Regions:
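Bacterial N-terminal signal peptides that target proteins for export
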Residues: 2-16
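Bacterial N-terminal signal peptides
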Residues: 12-26
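Extracellular beta-strand ligand-recognition surfaces/modules
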Residues: 127, 182-192, 196-234
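Short carbohydrate-recognition loop motifs
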Residues: 64-85
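Extracellular beta-strand elements of beta-rich domains used
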Residues: 43, 223, 241-245
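Extracellular carbohydrate-recognition regions
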Residues: 31-57, 140-147, 255
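Extracellular/luminal beta-rich ligand-recognition
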Residues: 122, 126, 132-180
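Extracellular/lumenal carbohydrate-interaction signature centered on repeated Trp-anchored short motifs
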Residues: 89-100, 193-196, 216
Length: 255
């Protein structure tokens, strides 16, 4: 599955959101939220309903593989001057299970990436949460922008997105708009090489992040994971495992 970033000036406003446009909308394959945990990525029994999506056939895709990595059932992503995503639809109740847990790892951070520049919008590891926002909470300008984007990319272009990234230079805790569009907010969870080379556990209150960045009515509809090197031409290897939603007061599941 491969998704590519267009650099066309006519679509730059929502370029990073359009990377997820080819994913199916939430349906029977999506995870249903309960009191938790709600598993969305075990990677020990096949990929479904995760899918590979490619928007630009000219852009080199990443390589994705299921593997056991240091005893962990995981998805491995290898990226070499390439960009593609593995994504899936989700339906999750933010009032019940707002916290997303996962493990990830990288071999090393990128060297020349710079999230403040379009030319440097690459990451050793990247997790997308795409959002839907009720029409009543969208400005006329935003509705117009989304209508144009969907006329180009299709009806599943999301309203907004939060990206959790393993960066190479910005400090942990950095939050700023994506270099292509302010409808995607970048959140730096790891930075540099300090935690590289092994599995790192993350526990993030996505509900809180989404409400703060895009309003309380925004809800997750898609997840995607990747390593991203198409702009810098570098190489990266990342792993993802054990993605699941839990209640705010609950611990992440151990496997």
């Amino acid at each position: 599955m491969n998704i590519r970033k267009s650099r066309s000036s006519t679509t730059a406003l929502l370029t990073s959101l359009a990377l997820l446009a080819a994913l199916p909308l939430p349906g029977s394959a999506a995870a249903s939220a309960g009191d938790g945990p709600v598993w969305v990525g075990r990677f020990d029994g096949g990929l479904a309903p995760w899918q590979e999506v490619r928007l630009n056939a000219k852009l080199k895709p990443n390589n994705f593989a299921l593997r056991h990595w240091d005893g962990v059932a995981a998805l491995e992503v290898q990226s070499a001057g390439s960009m593609s995503l593995l994504g899936r639809p989700v339906t999750v109740d933010m009032a019940r299970t707002p916290v997303l847990c996962w493990r990830w790892r990288i071999d090393a951070p990128l060297k020349s990436a710079d999230l403040t520049q379009r030319s440097g919008d690459d990451y050793a590891a990247r997790l997308y949460v795409s959002l839907a926002i009720p029409d009543a909470d969208k400005s006329l300008g935003l509705r117009t922008q989304l209508r144009i984007a969907r006329s180009i990319w299709g009806p599943s272009v999301p309203d907004a997105a939060v990206n959790y990234v393993w960066d190479n230079r910005q400090p942990v805790g950095t939050e700023r708009p994506n270099a292509y569009t302010d409808r995607t907010m970048m959140v730096v969870l790891r930075s540099g090489a300090a935690d590289a080379g092994g599995w790192v556990q993350e526990r993030r209150n996505v509900g809180s992040d989404v409400a703060r960045l895009f309003g309380a009515s925004a809800t997750p509809v898609q997840l995607a994971i990747t390593a991203d090197t198409d702009n810098t031409g570098e190489t990266a290897r990342a792993g993802f495992a054990d993605l699941h939603w839990v209640p705010e007061q609950a611990a992440c599941e151990k496997r």
